[in-house]
Amino acid sequence: WGSFGEGRSKKAESLNSVAVPELERLAAEDKPFMLFLRHMDPHSPYLPPEPFERMFYAGDENDPNNHSLDPVYDFLPFRDYFCSWFPPKCTDAEYICAQYDGSIAYMDASIRIILDKLEYLGIADDTIVVFTSDHGETLYDHDCYFDHHSMYDNCLIVPLAIKFGKGCKKYFRGCKHVQTYAYEKDIMPTILAMLGIETDVKFDGRNLFDVLDGKVPEEPECYITEATWMRKHGWRTPEWKLMVALEPDFHFKPEIELYNLIEDPKENHNVADKYPEVVELLKKRMLDHVAKREKETGRTAPIYTNLNWNGFGRPFTSSEEAYRTMHIGNPEDAKRLQEIKKQD
């Protein structure tokens, strides 16, 4: 992962240094190939190399009068981890956000090298390139600092771009705009369709070109879950987002969260108490979906059975217990930091 003391790592360039020769080898073989590249930027720790470090920041990250990072340093479960890659004496949260932006710009430049190589090798027209991510990120949002373990849209919504050339020209739709939802489960059936590969496998996802052409139903509502740093599930519609905690989380969030995504797209105002009838309606849709999937698969939903997700052996009984137990970073340092906080 890297740390500030180890220096800024050119992670994307390191991967490209392996990927480019592999592309050359595969192109020379002149056979069908699949190449998976897992660029880690802009995953934390955000340590983009120069000049990307200051591309989006012109302030003083060590300003002693700036206290925007105080609540970040005060969050015990992640404090040890943050201190490992934040610059020493850094006080400005905007500087850390700028490192994330710089990491994105650095990755964009590195992906450009891959795309240019496909053109240079003369295989761009016969190559499908899929660009996506496994999660988004919260920066200074929802008091979930520089993390991605939640069910807010910051984390749920990810990019999906599919680039293809003349070899797949029948899939070109011009400048067509369709306002609908795509899911990562749709990627495999879409790619198989583009390659003309038929299979008897019944996918949960859809061919997105069928979605664009109106041949399959839209899926405007979806079931959402989180079971890494918290155990929650919920239901999302174009208008509403419901989140239900199955046990207390270490962010001290309420058990029920409801957001109006039309009026409050950044999900800053929990209106669960104001609209209890909406909570019950969405909860019923969610539980009906879970019951349907349990019947289809013959399995109990893992969100109910994975009770040792936290490594603690049982569900947490309070947010305070979760806060005092969970941590990322060096275990001994985390324990020491928590003991100091207890003494305070």
Pin down the residues of each PLM region.
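Catalytic domains that recognize anionic headgroups
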Residues: W1-D344
